[in-house]
Amino acid sequence: MLGQMMTQPLLISSLIDHAARYHGQTEIVSVETDGTVTRTNWGEIAANARRMGSALTKLGLQPQDRIGTLAWNNRRHLEIYYAASGAGFVCHTINPRLFPEQLVYIINHAQDRVLFFDATFLPLVAAIRDQLTEVKHFVLMGPRNEDALQQIPGLEFYDELIETGDTDFEWPVFDENTASSLCYTSGTTGHPKGVLYSHRSTVLHSFASNTRDVIGYSAMDVVMPVVPMFHVNAWGSPYGCAMSGAQMVLPGPDLHGEALVNLIDTYGVTLAMGVPTIWQGLLAHAAKCGTKLESLERTVIGGAACPPSMIATFREKYGVDTVHAWGMSEMSPLGTANIPLAKHRKLPIEEQHKLRENQGRPPFGVELKIVDDDGNDLPHDGVTQGDLMVRGHWVLDSYFQLKDQELLQDGWFATGDVATLDPDGYMTIRDRSKDIIKSGGEWISSVELENIAVAHPKLATAAVIGVPHPKWDERPLLVAVKAEGEDPSEAELLEFFDGKIAKWQVPDKVVFVDALPLNATGKVLKRKLRDEFKDALTG
């Protein structure tokens, strides 16, 4: 016997319709590529998305055709999010900071039919357009620009294309398992791989994100996603904010500390989201200019392990709660979020603070386990380390156009992380499988060493890598960036590890660099560091 309840498909178009209907006047602030600020609202975003959805349909596209974007966090990009998916196409957000050869591969592999791009990327698109064999429409995200038209003959313009759309366009209704959006992971070996999300997985992910024990967007919030919209759908924030009716501040291309501090203080941002490297710049500028960040209530930090010193600075200096989270493209990306349990209120304050340093617990919809090298389940005791496995409602089962390749292990996806799980489900990432340092048969966590190093007041940032050693196979090397105006010695930095870890885990050497190589989302490119310093202990 079946239940007698209504059945309605979980579609992304329903999110923007909800935002328009019940939060239509809620403001969206957008920093454009030229630095100007546009103030709009959910009602206008929804109306424009509907018109653009109609305009795309009139181009003669087929259902499920891919719509590519090379764009920053701005209002037009937000409109495309809903226009493409809502009209039955697939919104393919592309990382513009990849090498041109990688971009050509990704756009052709995805078979994008339309490519929207911000003015910032006009020279890039002009240089590779002849290699983009599947793209039929190149669209500059802005008004008509004659100079751009000279560079790309036949170029179309967002502000003109949207005028061809109907204001009364009706969103099509289809199976909720229909593909909605596409992101490519930057593979460490071989070509990047596509992760194809569905309407169902995206809406369920939004429900989970909106719970109080995860991110908990609210109509009372002013949300600034600093994580790019080309990176795993900006962690789902455009969908979660529409579902909750939160205000949004879209920061555009300038993600330096000064620009972000100004946006927080000017528009009363209450919740901001980004990777640790972004917050390092923000905290440095906040300290320099003396702001109190009075409106900011919480930050969500993911993408890489968050140093405990950063959590402490946010808490102690600015009264900001930090939600340490973890996920990956293959998980839409939400996997865990660190929110304390009721029983933790009774813990001494120092233990409460220590608890907030791990990556947190999974929400309903995600399951975690750890296994040994033979695939055997390991205990959730908070001590035993193993390979982290996941499954859930918004976890992939195969990569785009690679459905025939066996990916899952007994229904579980191998994340490539080494982790521990405690009895309450709190997960701690010990390292990436490829980054953990194997020295004399023992494992050394590069993350643990980095957390200690970046707490040194004379360092701006640091990374730890394993490099070849003639006796121990591998040993840790500290790659450090000095703080402005500081000149720490190698001995001074190595002494900083005393009493914090076992002596045999202390890095063998320190090398100083002007900056760490980062990818587009702020993650350190450790493979590049390993290549550069592979002879540091043997040469």
Swiss-Prot record:
Outcome of substituting K523A: Retains 1.6% of wild-type activity
Effect annotated for changing K523R: Retains 57% of wild-type activity
Regulation of this protein's activity per its record: ADP acts as a competitive inhibitor and inhibits the ligase activity.
Induction: Expression is up-regulated in the presence of DMSP.
pH dependence: Optimum pH is 8.0-9.0.
Result when mutating K434A: Retains 36% of wild-type activity
Temperature-related properties: Optimum temperature is 40 degrees Celsius.
Binding residue positions for Mg(2+): T185, E330
GO molecular function: ATP binding; ligase activity; metal ion binding
UniProt cross-references to InterPro entries, sorted A to Z: AMP-bd_C, AMP-bd_C_sf, AMP-binding_CS, AMP-dep_synth/lig_dom, ANL_N_sf
Keyword terms: ATP-binding, Fatty acid metabolism, Ligase, Lipid metabolism, Magnesium, Metal-binding, Nucleotide-binding
Residues that coordinate or bind ATP: H231, G303, H324, A325, S329, Q359, D417, R432, K523
Keyword Transmembrane helix: no
Site entry (Plays an important role in catalysis), positions: K523
CDD domains in the record: ttLC_FACS_AlkK_like
Any one biological process term the GO annotation gives: fatty acid metabolic process
PROSITE patterns per the UniProt record, alphabetical: AMP_BINDING (PS00455)
Mutagenesis or variant effect for K526A: Retains 48% of wild-type activity
Family designation: Belongs to the ATP-dependent AMP-binding enzyme family.
Assembly, per entry: Homodimer.
Domain notes: Each monomer consists of a large N-terminal domain (Met-1 to Arg-432) and a small C-terminal domain (Ser-433 to Gly-539). The active center is located at the interface between the two domains. Undergoes two sequential conformational changes to catalyze the ligation of MMPA and CoA.
Protein name: 3-methylmercaptopropionyl-CoA ligase
Species this chain originates from: Ruegeria lacuscaerulensis (strain DSM 11314 / KCTC 2953 / ITI-1157)
Gene encoding the protein: dmdB
